[in-house]
Regions:
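RNase H-like, Mg2+-dependent phosphodiesterase core
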Residues: 1-212
Length: 212
């Protein structure tokens, strides 16, 4: 069996959670949680491909997305820009993971389990056992699966938003500040889906760099 599944098995009953979208200048942040009740033999071949979603091709993520959705208990949460601006991106990410985990726990009626959280922060105001796993999407099958659900869902969301605002190229850059995205902001200004706090920090940093 995949070493990522072995890692989960060594921790007992686990759910894994991850987010996508902390770094972009536009769009919400997505969080997902995954619980695999069992891994049937016919799924192992597909799920052996599980790894950090950023290392997989878009085609591989799409294929795994459907397998994960259909063979796990899962939840996907979107925290919108308005909420990000109110509570900051870190708190928004943790809130999304908390809500996703609580939904999975309720669906699966879990007891005596542990939550594996990708990164180096624990979920705040969370009443269940948890531990963070640095680079967990390359270590835990449940976290890797959650990473794929979050990233694919967010990419689709940004592609849909791009239909409304094609000038920013979100279907290609997913809201990250590429040169083309910055040029579009300079030409067209900000949309309602941009994150003002992120952009303020970016431009302040750029201004400081030009002083040296």
């Amino acid at each position: 069996m995949n070493e990522l599944f072995e890692f989960d098995k060594s921790n007992g009953i686990v759910i894994g959670t991850d987010e996508a979208g902390r770094g972009p200048a536009a769009g919400g942040v997505f969080a997902a949680c995954v619980y695999f009740p069992e891994i049937r033999e016919n799924l192992i071949k597909d799920l052996l491909k599980l790894n950090d979603s950023k290392k997989l091709s878009a085609k591989a993520r799409k294929s795994l997305y459907d397998v994960i959705l259909n063979n796990s208990i899962n939840a996907i949460i979107d925290i919108e820009v308005e909420e990000i601006e109110k509570i900051n991106i870190l708190n928004a990410s943790l809130k999304g993971m908390k809500l996703a985990c609580e939904e999975v726990i309720k669906k699966a009626q879990l007891e005596n389990f542990i939550t594996l959280v990708d990164g180096n922060k624990l979920i705040r105001n969370y009443t269940y056992p948890q531990k963070f796993i640095i680079k967990g999407d390359g270590k835990s099958a449940s976290i890797a699966a959650a990473s794929i659900l979050a990233k694919v869902s967010r990419d689709r969301y940004m592609t849909k938003l791009s239909e409304e605002y094609p000038q920013y190229g979100w279907n290609k850059n997913a809201g990250y500040l590429t040169a083309e995205h910055l040029k579009a902001i300079d030409t067209y200004g900000l949309s309602k889906y941009h994150r003002p706090s992120f952009l303020r920090k970016h431009f302040e940093k750029q201004k400081q760099l030009t002083l040296f």
